[in-house]
Amino acid sequence: MHRLFILFLLFLSNSIFAQQFIAAGKLTFERKVAQVSLMENLYENGGEDNIWITEMKKVYPKIVTDYYTLGFNNNSTLYKVEKENTDNKYMLTGLKPSDQSYVYQDFNQGLTTMSKALFENEYFVKDSVKQFQWKITGEVRDIAGFECKKAITKINDSVVVVAFYTDQILVKGGPENFNGLPGMILGLAVPRLALTLFATKLELTTPPLAFNLPSKPKFVKHSQIALDVEKGLKNWGKEGKAIAWISNL
């Protein structure tokens, strides 16, 4: 009887936690890019390029993994790299994270402030929060102990992004610039880029959402970055397209 009572209390505590709605905390995300698969997809039937990829396989790891944090409170989020993995080798410009980059989203004001390193330049963005057209499906999966629902959108007109969100976390944000679902995005997959981003743990804390800006930053819009990327990569072929897609996440 005593054992049954203890089991009942454990079940009750788990049920209470499952019903808890969270407004502040810090998530850790694991970001993986299967870079060999990405390059093979880009240069499928590419002749000499396939020979180059075969040689690169001998030098570069098949998958590169980095870790990011997403702090959230007061209906705002701050996404940044947790620490740079200096052992990683990246086959494609744009895959390597920068500890100077971050994305701050203020959903009360509908504004994004962002620092992004591209082509040896550092961009400071102040613009409206990006809008995404989501289609929610019936599929569910568990991520970091939360039941998450699946949703699908596209970037750059044709690049499919799959997201998994939980409505137990009240802030309607997510990693990178993604947002707009009925809760926090805990998982992302971009098959065309062989990229996944999944939350691995949640710390129940109220993190300060602090980020650095120069004394007189020159802010640009998201569209300016897209134009500069297009101009800088116009002769890069399929590889340039992939870098452009990555920069638009």
Please provide the spans of the model-predicted regions.
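Sec-dependent N-terminal signal peptides
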Residues: L4-S13
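Sec/Tat signal peptide C-region and signal peptidase I cleavage site
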Residues: N14-A18
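Extended soluble regions of mature proteins
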Residues: Q20-L249
